[in-house]
Amino acid sequence: MAKQKKHPTGTIAQNKKARHDYFIEHKFEAGLVLSGWEVKSLRAGKAHLTDSYVLLKDGEAWLFGSHITPLTTASTHVIADPIRSRKLLLNKRELERVEAAVAQKGYTCVALALYWSKHLIKCEIALGKGKKEFDKRDTVRERDSNRELQRAVRNKGKED
C-alpha cells in the first residue's frame, strides 16, 4: 500500500461556514471519543463538519451533525453510523465556561476543525455569536477591500 500524504498542518476537516456565520470569540481544543473505523476514515480525510454543533447534556459535551464517511474496506460486523453523536473530552473548567456562555442569550458552540495533534485527533470548538445578514455583507466587503489592497501592493513592486 502506498504511503498516504499527510496534511501540511495536520488538518482533517474545517467548518468554513461557521467562520462566516458566527463572530468567533473563544476557542477550545477538545478530544473525541471515536471507534476504530472512524479513525481509519479520518486518516483518509473522509469527514465533514459543515452543519456540526456542540450540545451540552448532563455535564458532558457532544458533537452533533458531523459526518464521517465509512471506508468501503471497513469491517462489516460493526454497523457504521456516519452521523452519530460523538462525545467531546474537555476538562471541568472548560465545560463550565462553555456552559455559562451558552446559557447567555445569543451564544452558541460550534465545531471549527478536526486535526491531528501528535497521534490524537482533536476537535477545535468555539464560542460564537450569530452574525446578521448585514454583518456577513460587511465581512465580505472588508475581505474584498483587503484583497484589492494586497493586489495593489504586489503590483506596485513589479512596476519599479
UniProtKB/Swiss-Prot annotation:
Highest taxon above the source species: Bacteria
A Pfam short name: SmpB
Matches recorded under InterPro entries: SmpB, SsrA-bd_prot, SsrA-bd_prot_CS
The entry's keywords: Cytoplasm, RNA-binding
CC per GO annotation: cytosol
Localization in the cell: Cytoplasm
Family: Belongs to the SmpB family.
Function: Required for rescue of stalled ribosomes mediated by trans-translation. Binds to transfer-messenger RNA (tmRNA), required for stable association of tmRNA with ribosomes. tmRNA and SmpB together mimic tRNA shape, replacing the anticodon stem-loop with SmpB. tmRNA is encoded by the ssrA gene; the 2 termini fold to resemble tRNA(Ala) and it encodes a 'tag peptide', a short internal open reading frame. During trans-translation Ala-aminoacylated tmRNA acts like a tRNA, entering the A-site of stalled ribosomes, displacing the stalled mRNA.
Protein name: SsrA-binding protein
Organism: Pseudomonas putida (strain W619)
Primary gene name: smpB
